[in-house]
């Protein structure tokens, strides 16, 4: 199993670069190979996952490929069911606020996952409770094989959530490294300073 990240290069590089080891938590998805590399995982660690070796740092060889993780760094295990990890991210952010932990939670997936109820619940809860979660939605125009126009009301998926209070929305071109770095840097600084969620 392999899900390529071509066309997602800019945003994935940026996610990994703003992820602060020791402070932040990262919940990525199966297409986030460059995110994992950019966050500091090695090519060897990714290959160990891909060939299900016992020395895979995420699962000891028990996960399917493209499920990159390094729990000791808070690069958390990937769920195959898309969108469910947004709830995990919101829960971790709630604990971070409760225990006054400095840092943010970053969660990432494709745009079609925003059609899932899990995602709505997570964004709603993070907005209501003012949680430092950065929801990164990588929009390539298709959800598996379904065109975006057949699954969402707004041309830009994040705009479906524009009515939520305490929620900042930042648009960027995920193919453009500089635009993506600017967006992710702004998102992390905003979430950290204001303790509010952001959609990128």
What residue spans do the PLM features occupy?
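Residue-level recognition of the N-termini of beta-strands and the immediately preceding loop/turn
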Residues: 103-105, 133, 196-200
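Thiamine diphosphate
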Residues: 137-199
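Residue-level recognition of short, well-ordered coil/turn positions
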Residues: 23, 131, 192-196
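Cofactor-binding active-site loop characterized by glycine-rich and histidine/acidic residues
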Residues: 1-129, 136, 147-166
